[in-house]
Amino acid sequence: MDKEILTMEEAAELFGVSIKTFIKLLKEEKVPGRKIGREWRFSRLALINWLASGDSQAYSASETEVKEFFNKVAPQWEEIGRNYSDETLKTKLIELNILKKSMILVDLGAGDGFISRFTAPFVKKVIAVDISGEMLRELGRKAKAGGIKNIETLESDAQDVPLADSSVDMVCANMYLHHIEQPELALQEMHRIVKPGGVVFLADLYEHSDGDLMNKMHDRWPGFDPDQLVAGFKRTGFQDVRYEMLPGPPVRTYCGSTPEPVRTGTKVFIIVAWK
């Protein structure tokens, strides 16, 4: 029989979200619960009834939907994302001269390892973080086939990474942020785990109006205005923040077992931010 009274950890699991996201719900959405001393307790029935009402379902579903989508498409991701991973990013990483042999680099939303596998030879260690276990298995398979041995994988919500404060030298986030329910929370997590003097390299979509794309790719955001995102980095505490639009043709993305183009005309930008 299921427990009727739940701890915060058990309640977050019921919602299908991270502890950090659940705490935000507690503060903003009046989740039914009772604080006894320093501990929270929740009625399973009350939570289920709350989840069944109104827009609250979106919060619990968002992380689960993204995870299920990427678990499903992982075996075909090399074809689906063929033109989603811009080769120009590799050139920019080299041009910026920010990869060092002594570095521990975290790749948030690593997917099948487009960034992880490229950067691994240039750094001491890569920690590839993704919410999808199937994607990480694809990454591991491809890394092994390529003889790459310095990538660790970590299945985790990238908004709540189980890494110590100021413990890594660099964070990469390629085509990750538009899948996140709360982008500013993700920026705060990047700031938390990177060392003083460390750097974040982010690539994402310029804002667009392609609703069909968002539905097919389970995007939470229609890209971003880079100026607003730069302001978000600065609010989070990053000291030196720069962005540029990538040159070249717009991104083309494919979705489905028989690849079918679903995006044209969407540009990509990068942000480089030092703590």
PLM segments and residue spans:
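Polyanion-binding surface elements
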Residues: 1-20
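Short helix-start
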Residues: 8, 31-55
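Major-groove DNA-recognition helix of helix-turn-helix-type DNA-binding domains
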Residues: 15-39
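Conserved class I S-adenosyl-L-methionine
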Residues: 59-100, 114-118, 138, 145-146, ...
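C-terminal alpha-helical "lid/dimerization" subdomain adjacent to the S-adenosyl-L-methionine
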Residues: 78-81, 201-272
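Class I SAM-dependent methyltransferase SAM/SAH-binding core
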Residues: 106-160
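A conserved beta-strand element that flanks and buttresses the S-adenosyl-L-methionine
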Residues: 172
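A short glycine-rich, Lys/Arg-flanked "PGG" loop and its adjoining helix->strand segment in the class I
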Residues: 184-196
